């Protein structure tokens, strides 16, 4: 009979399992190593490509500089040649004037002059005349070439960053509910100790209850209801029309000493139809002190705002 096959022992199973796990770990390590090598190779390729591009840019810049230097040198050489030509012409003309100009001498010299010399002199005179007429064109060409090189170099220069203040930060810090305010409270802003009120009249008749003005240091008037403390809905009023600001100011006391007191002031914020105190228009962007029983009007509205406080006489 054939011997019966035995199942592997638990120890053998554990060994096989450990061996299989090691093989799996090795294969994973090999895969990870392969990935790392590929990443390194790709990074090296990218670096090589970047170096090649940098070399190409440097080469282009050097070539442009060489072209500019050659053009400038050629322009200088042309100028030097023209200067030499002028000097030679001056010397030749000076020598001709120094010689005798009598008719007998001229006829004697012309008879002795050889035909070759006459032809050569005529050729020189023609070349000088042509060169003199071409001088301005050569100068214009050299100047045009130099300007073209300078413009090309200037175009390649990158625009330098500007570090000047743009005012955007200050604008963002002075925003309320998405709207840029036209007014900033001054350092001397304070809440009033007196209970000031505005009594509203229209055509001599009081409207609603008086407006209390003692709970905060400033009150904004205007048509923009999202930011106005006291809305003024008349079409002639601006969105940010005017502001009443309480300021702590120095004041002389009855005994002659200086003391501080919180007083109300009004400022027109550059409105279209102005702000009025006792029927007189006030200048924009300037503080005007308000006194008890002053009457304020905004734009062409018929409403009148009378300023009083709790201790005002009836």
From Swiss-Prot:
Database matches in PROSITE patterns: FHA_DOMAIN
Chain residue ranges for the region called Disordered: 1-146
One GO process term, biological-process aspect: regulation of developmental growth
InterPro entries recorded: Cell_Proc_Reg/RNA_Proc, FHA_dom, SMAD_FHA_dom_sf
Tissue-specific expression: Expressed in roots, lateral roots, vascular strands of roots and leaves, vegetative meristems, pollen and developing seeds.
Record keyword Nucleus present: yes
Domain of life: Eukaryota
SUPFAM superfamilies, alphabetized: SMAD/FHA domain
Function: Involved in the microRNA (miRNA) and short interfering RNA (siRNA) biogenesis. May facilitate DCL1 to access or recognize primary miRNAs. Binds RNA non-specifically.
Protein name: FHA domain-containing protein DDL
Gene: DDL
């Amino acid at each position: 009979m054939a011997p019966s096959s035995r199942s592997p022992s638990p120890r053998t199973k554990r060994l096989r399992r450990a061996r299989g796990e090691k093989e799996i770990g090795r294969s994973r390590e090999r895969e990870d190593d392969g990935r790392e090598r590929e990443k390194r190779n790709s990074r090296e390729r990218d670096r090589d490509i970047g170096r090649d591009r940098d070399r190409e840019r440097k080469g282009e810049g050097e070539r442009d500089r060489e072209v500019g230097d050659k053009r400038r040198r050629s322009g200088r050489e042309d100028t030097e040649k023209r200067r030499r030509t002028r000097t030679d012409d001056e010397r030749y003309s000076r020598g001709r004037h120094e010689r005798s100009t009598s008719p007998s001498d001229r006829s004697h010299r012309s008879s002795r002059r050889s035909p070759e010399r006459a032809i050569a002199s005529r050729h020189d005179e023609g070349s000088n005349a042509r060169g003199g007429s071409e001088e301005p064109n050569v100068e214009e060409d050299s100047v045009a070439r130099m300007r073209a090189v300078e413009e090309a170099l200037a175009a390649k220069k990158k625009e330098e960053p500007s570090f000047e203040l743009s005012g955007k930060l200050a604008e963002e810090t002075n925003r309320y509910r998405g709207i840029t305010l036209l007014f900033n409270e001054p350092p001397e802003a304070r809440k009033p100790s007196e209970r000031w009120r505005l009594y509203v009249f229209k055509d001599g008749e009081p409207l609603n209850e008086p407006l209390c003005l003692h709970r905060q240091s400033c009150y904004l008037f205007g048509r923009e209801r999202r930011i106005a403390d006291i809305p003024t809905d008349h079409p002639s009023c601006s969105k940010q029309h005017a502001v009443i600001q309480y300021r702590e100011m120095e004041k002389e006391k009855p005994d002659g000493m200086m003391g501080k007191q919180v007083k109300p002031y009004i400022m027109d914020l550059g409105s279209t139809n102005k702000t009025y105190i006792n029927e007189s228009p006030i200048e924009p962007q300037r503080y005007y002190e308000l006194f008890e029983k002053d009457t304020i009007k905004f734009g062409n509205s018929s409403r009148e705002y009378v300023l009083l406080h709790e201790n005002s006489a009836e």
